[in-house]
């Protein structure tokens, strides 16, 4: 039997951990030996307000079970404060789970600039700020695990969520670039796109739908990706209800068009079936792999 995964000596910072997914992430890591900073503003699903109650409640659960944790209510847009609080309390940071977020759903034709900017500030800019503050410490100790949180809305799009969908797909672009930069320093970065009962999903899904989608079924994947044994990086995973799947980019073989006399709109139309044919598709996993068609055209440098 495989030895239990432990996180003794590790320190984790989990944002948005006062309830839902963040709470179960924090509880699981603490139960396996990690010291955890439970960050949460304590605001509602639409944002606004500060209340230490939700974060402190999770801390109380952890300490009652014999773990170590501290509550924090700083905004992720002030990421350095979260990281400083983690270092002040526990002396290091090893694991960062960017989970904080809220919804501001509105059809695009009714969307205000503030609806866009408020979602950007927390989901994307907030993830940047906290990760950017933690990054030098992860590099210095040559160890780090970062989890960014996406959504099916980011992968597939969803009505009334152009703001949220945009940030949630952008988060994975953030992950992919960080994975490239961090690998040499043993900083591994992955994205999860969870489907689970939470304060956010309760605003758009029924109680009956959410019954089998417990957040406890998501956190084991997040914790696995944070363990030193796991060497996965740059991955995107959908997870929920006891199911886990990995996604990757897929590209058709495409069509090489004659360029001697320039390329016309009609040339594109004539080649459209070939351009769109996914039989024999490729799965480029890096800039180098993605650039092969252009390298073939340009020839050796």
PLM-predicted stretches and their roles:
Residues 3-38:
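Canonical Rossmann dinucleotide-binding motif of NAD(H)/NADP(H)-dependent dehydrogenases/reductases
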Residues 25, 31-32, 140, 156, ...:
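Active-site-adjacent segment of SDR/Rossmann-fold oxidoreductases
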Residues 191, 209-300:
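C-terminal helical subdomain
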Residues 59, 63, 69-73, 77-91:
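Conserved amphipathic alpha-helix within the SDR
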